[in-house]
Amino acid sequence: MLRRVVITSLAVTNCLPLLLTLPVQAAPAPVASGSWVMVPQSKDANSDGFIDGDGGVPASGALALQPSTTYVGAGNYIAQPNERLIGGALSWYLDPAGYPVQLTACASTGANYVWTISQGQTIVKTTPERTIKKKTCKTTVTLPEGDYNFKLTVKSGNAKRVQNLTATVKNYLMVALGDSYASGEGNPRNIEAWLTQAGSFSPYWDDDGCNRSARGGPAQAALRLEQSSPRTSVTLIYAACSGATVDRGILGPQPAAGASTSQVEQVRSLIGTRGIDILTISIGGNDVGFQSVLTTCALAANCPTAKAVTLPLSEYQDVQTGLQARIGQLPASLARIAPCFGGPCTLGNGSKSPGLVMNVGASVLPMPYPDITRAANGSACSYLTIDQADFTWARDTILTPTAPNPYPYQPSRGQSLALPMNSGTLNGAIFTTASTLGWNPVVGIWSASGDSSTGHGVCAADSAWAFGLTGITGFTSGSFHPNVKGQEVIGREIAKVVGVQ
């Protein structure tokens, strides 16, 4: 045994000179291959097609008929007044340092990497040196908007390689103001459960007082814009509220919805002097009394000549007279809003507000109202107690951009009446005033529903883009509002205006 060990030891010793003469293998030459993307700010982590929840979600059954009344924390991905902030945590959108950018070195070859971020000749940030591994090859930095040079340095042994990337950090700040057609009324997050199961229903809203939902068209447009490019991100400030008017909503408090300040003030409190890129606004329907029209038409035949049964039109001798008076006031009301978009303005109570800061080239996108009056074959609806003549009148004198003056209305009995149309239509006033103010209306919201050969109104069955009567009791607020498909179309048309197909 001893002899065998000695022989083995001698053999190993004799091999040592040979091993020492082998060359040391050089480290592989480094390759610098980097990329960058903006971290999405309008997130859809569960890929359901809608921006994720606000500051809190039901502890269970969020999308069921009866969600839990206990809320738990979740990521804040929509900035809204009256957010449900679990634990009082502030939202990410208040970060004054800027917006998150993800830098990736995963396609590089080497041992370690570092990013150097500069503007002109000034280095603004250098990341810690990290190893190139699957778990460590990405790093996130927070940067203000602007133009940058991202320099990736990859090291391998004593060698290094460098790659320079030019980048523009851009976050679109989008603000959504307005009424129920913008807030997503009728479309709580758990609407699918109600549509498929019916029965007792507790709607889960992002904001209970305003019946605001991420299923609303402006929120869907924000997500479309977010997903259109990895080199930009989108921050949505969502303040639209069901029931809003110019003075009770946009320029003043809306106590019935729990809003103690105007939407302009609410947005200002959230973003301060940060510049807005896109602002959508849906307003006018409640100002002119559209709900009063629907209620009266449901209860009275020949409703344009009937006395309105609810405010605000009950203050006038008949529905038609009240509508024309109210539509005639709308351009001046919209003009009072305009100064708030870019400078100081006067609120509804006469007090002064610094208004909202608008970036150079910002877009103000007024939203006309869609056509809810036609059947799938294009003819006027006859729905519940509202007959075709009154649906035709409502379409022609409220929703179409232009109308004959006078308007020939044929009541159920007697001769045709020539109804004065000196103030035009609701949508006509929106389009005309938008042109005067330099706003860019989302024409497609009207044309997709109103100019198409197929009707998408409340009686259009599977082609309907609007709810009919959603219930006698309980969940009634969605009646005569855009349904799931209708809000999808609104989101699509808003996105088109900002260049997203």
Task: Annotate each PLM feature.
Residues 182-188, 246-249, 290, 374-375:
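Short, solvent-exposed loop/turn elements at domain surfaces
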